[in-house]
């Protein structure tokens, strides 16, 4: 007797294609490996679409201590169809369209019970704590708690852009930063998270200042609602922002993650402003160097706020905003590639990220 229920069991060869790296920083490659099986409370998802994110690059470079077993399958933003479920699963059904947050909570601790699974001490992250979604199938734990129903009105590629970047920006702007109508918001870094932050802040009624070194990224930010665009390579950012808002902005968001962007973001704030740090600053990358000018934080009584994903239970509000047309994350998708093309795309991130969001389609044919 099998311990799991699955679709197409008679046709299941038990093998799948997956991108793996065998050494940190070494060339990732497309391998054929065993297809995962669900745990008792888990599910296996057939990956229809998965996002390529800078966090995947950090993991590949060895910046994430949770990746302890090599070879490793990266990928943490995905949407797909439930292929198999464990014996204990009651809510999730085979064939369901789902999206999964990149932080999967335990579902029982005080943080999960209070709606804050994104900081669950026993959290599990696909692509970091275990095999990820750069594959034809991915397994997740505690499916009833972590799998979110994806409305049929939202395409899979759009759904794949939500689990990390868009959801993180949504919570960072709406809940953590508590952006209000009429406030000035400066967004540093207009990649996937930054562009989402621009769009979401604009939808909240804020006036957005976008900062990036790429003209193309700034053009996308303008198209997403930014009222002002500052080229950090050509302009003195501090002076340029004060030229827009002499007293400083109300909220700053570092969506990139570097000593330069986090410092500039804090300096851009008014007295008693709010800084939201979303971009990663891993110790393996920056060492012990201070990234926040604490004298400015103290002197201006600035609030420094971290934002780490969004719990599955909070997704319906964001999905409703997408269904209603208030938010349109699909406009950020700039490239769709096959699983065969994913290794080269991951390596190319060492030379910088292309503007917009890249989506990998594991079921797509080459060419």
Protein language model regions, located:
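Mid-domain Rossmann-like dinucleotide-binding core that forms the NAD(H)/NADP(H) cofactor-binding site
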Residues: 97-98, 154-234, 239, 298
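Glycine-rich beta-strand-centered segment in the early N-terminal region that forms part
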Residues: 36-50, 63-110, 151-153
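Glycine-rich phosphate-binding loop and adjacent beta-alpha segment
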Residues: 259-324, 361-367
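Residue-level marker of beta-strand positions
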Residues: 77, 96-97, 111, 137, ...
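A short acidic, Gly/Pro-enriched loop at the edge of an enzyme's catalytic core
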Residues: 240-252
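C-terminal hydrophobic helical "lid"/dimerization subdomain
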Residues: 2-16, 34, 263-266, 311-367
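NAD(P)H dinucleotide-binding glycine-rich loop of Rossmann-like/cofactor-binding domains
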Residues: 106-188
């Amino acid at each position: 007797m099998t311990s799991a229920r699955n679709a197409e069991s008679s046709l299941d060869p038990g093998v799948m294609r997956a991108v793996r790296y065998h050494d940190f920083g070494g060339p990732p490659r497309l391998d054929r490996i065993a297809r995962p099986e669900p745990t008792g409370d888990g599910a296996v998802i057939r990956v229809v679409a998965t996002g390529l994110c800078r966090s995947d690059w950090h993991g590949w470079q060895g910046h994430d201590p949770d990746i302890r077993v090599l070879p490793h399958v990266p990928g943490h933003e995905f949407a797909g169809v439930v292929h198999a479920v464990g014996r204990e699963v009651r809510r999730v059904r085979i064939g369901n369209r789902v999206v999964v947050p990149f932080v999967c909570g335990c579902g029982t601790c005080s943080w999960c019970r209070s709606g804050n699974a994104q900081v669950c001490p026993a959290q599990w992250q696909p692509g970091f704590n275990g095999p990820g979604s750069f594959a034809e199938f991915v397994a997740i734990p505690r499916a009833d708690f972590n799998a979110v129903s994806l409305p049929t009105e939202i395409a899979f590629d759009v759904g794949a852009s939500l689990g990390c970047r868009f959801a993180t920006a949504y919570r960072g702007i709406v809940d953590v930063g508590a952006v209000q109508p009429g406030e000035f918001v400066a967004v540093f870094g207009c990649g996937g998270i930054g562009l989402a932050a621009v769009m979401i802040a604009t939808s909240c009624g804020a006036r957005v200042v976008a900062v990036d070194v790429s003209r193309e990224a700034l053009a996308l930010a303008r198209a997403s609602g930014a009222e002002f665009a500052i080229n950090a390579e050509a302009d003195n950012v501090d002076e340029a922002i004060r030229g827009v808002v002499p007293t400083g902005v109300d909220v700053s968001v570092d969506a990139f993650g570097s000593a330069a962007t986090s410092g500039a973001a804090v300096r851009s704030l008014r007295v008693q402003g709010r800084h939201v740090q979303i971009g990663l600053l891993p110790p393996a990358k920056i060492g012990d160097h201070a990234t926040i000018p604490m004298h400015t934080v103290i002197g201006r009584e600035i609030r420094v706020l971290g934002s780490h994903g969004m719990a599955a239970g909070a997704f319906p509000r964001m999905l409703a905003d997408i269904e209603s047309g208030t938010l349109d994350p699909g406009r950020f998708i700039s490239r769709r590639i096959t699983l065969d093309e994913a290794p080269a795309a991951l390596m190319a991130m060492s030379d910088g990220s292309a503007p917009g969001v890249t989506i990998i389609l594991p079921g797509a044919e080459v060419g």
